[in-house]
Amino acid sequence: MEIILAEPRGFCAGVKRAVDILAITLKKYRNKRKVYVLHEIVHNKYIVEDFKRQGVIFVNSIRDIKDNRGILIFSAHGVSKNIEDKAKRKGIQVIDATCPLVSKVHKEAKRYEDSGKELILIGHKNHPEVKGIRGRVNNPIVLVQTLQNVRDLKVKNPDNLSYVTQTTLSTDDTREIITALKLRFPNITGPNLKDICYATQNRQNAVKKLTEIVDIVLIIGSKNSSNSNRLLDLCTARGKRAYLIDNYSYMDKSWLQGIEKIGITAGASAPDILVDELINHLKINVNTKVSVMSDGVTENVQFKIPHLV
């Protein structure tokens, strides 16, 4: 049996930056000040549970913070202006781990609003990134999730529209929605697919290639990870059997019956250790050869850690 690894896979620069910010902060203030994170630092169960064991306190609301002398970290997904203001009023020190690519969308949305445009956001309703983007502007943003939403859209002035997108969407689905928006509203302006993060696009392109050369795809990632779910959707859309699993223990041996080539990838918030554990588990159970797909993309993007850390 052959294992073929997608390239790239796993951590993106924004996730690595957020995880590093939290790790450095925890090391700096351990036994001195409590470290809080609003929501999950990234959408990965392993990462969150590991930080919990180290003493990080994850909260769902500013109200849940009991010690104002602590440090509050905003997750990689970003937050609304209202959340920022609440933290400021509480007087707690804040370190912002928002992915710079998400912050870029925040600025785009505000710039469009300041120019008088009515805003449309392509994204998933309950995702924290979407909540953050909607909360960066003063006026309501119309949310579009599907082509049907585009058909049903009611706007004030069809000639005065702009759109932005969540960074972790399917590039194929988003392209279709943008095309539909432009057909219905020819004067709409927006970034095309530039808001979708490079890492999301690279991982999706790698999985598309992977589905052509393997019999099954195993995707390491958590169920609440948007970009991991998009990898699963891509495999399914191409008729390739695929499973999204948190780690090797979720794998069912029956999945491998009659399989010669296994493709493995990982969402942008899944650490390398989980891929390594899956490979080792497979090696123990079956005779395997491991290789990396030959035409993958090497990523060299790095984001700076804020000076407060």
Swiss-Prot record:
The active site is at E129. Isopentenyl diphosphate binds at H43, H77, H127, S225, S226, N227, S269. (2E)-4-hydroxy-3-methylbut-2-enyl diphosphate binds at H43, H77, H127, T167, S225, S226, N227, S269. GO terms for molecular function: 4 iron, 4 sulfur cluster binding; 4-hydroxy-3-methylbut-2-enyl diphosphate reductase activity; metal ion binding. It is an enzyme of class 1 (oxidoreductase). It catalyses: isopentenyl diphosphate + 2 oxidized [2Fe-2S]-[ferredoxin] + H2O = (2E)-4-hydroxy-3-methylbut-2-enyl diphosphate + 2 reduced [2Fe-2S]-[ferredoxin] + 2 H(+); dimethylallyl diphosphate + 2 oxidized [2Fe-2S]-[ferredoxin] + H2O = (2E)-4-hydroxy-3-methylbut-2-enyl diphosphate + 2 reduced [2Fe-2S]-[ferredoxin] + 2 H(+). It comes from the Bacteria. One of its GO terms (biological process) is terpenoid biosynthetic process. Keywords: 4Fe-4S, Iron, Iron-sulfur, Isoprene biosynthesis, Metal-binding, Oxidoreductase. Its cofactor is [4Fe-4S] cluster. Its EC number is 1.17.7.4. Pathway: Isoprenoid biosynthesis; dimethylallyl diphosphate biosynthesis; dimethylallyl diphosphate from (2E)-4-hydroxy-3-methylbutenyl diphosphate: step 1/1; Isoprenoid biosynthesis; isopentenyl diphosphate biosynthesis via DXP pathway; isopentenyl diphosphate from 1-deoxy-D-xylulose 5-phosphate: step 6/6. [4Fe-4S] cluster binds at C12, C99, C197. Transmembrane segments: none annotated. Belongs to the IspH family. NCBIfam families: ispH_lytB (TIGR00216), PRK01045.1-4 (NF002190). Catalyzes the conversion of 1-hydroxy-2-methyl-2-(E)-butenyl 4-diphosphate (HMBPP) into a mixture of isopentenyl diphosphate (IPP) and dimethylallyl diphosphate (DMAPP). Acts in the terminal step of the DOXP/MEP pathway for isoprenoid precursor biosynthesis. This is 4-hydroxy-3-methylbut-2-enyl diphosphate reductase. The lineage of its organism: Bacteria, Pseudomonadati, Pseudomonadota, Alphaproteobacteria, Rickettsiales.
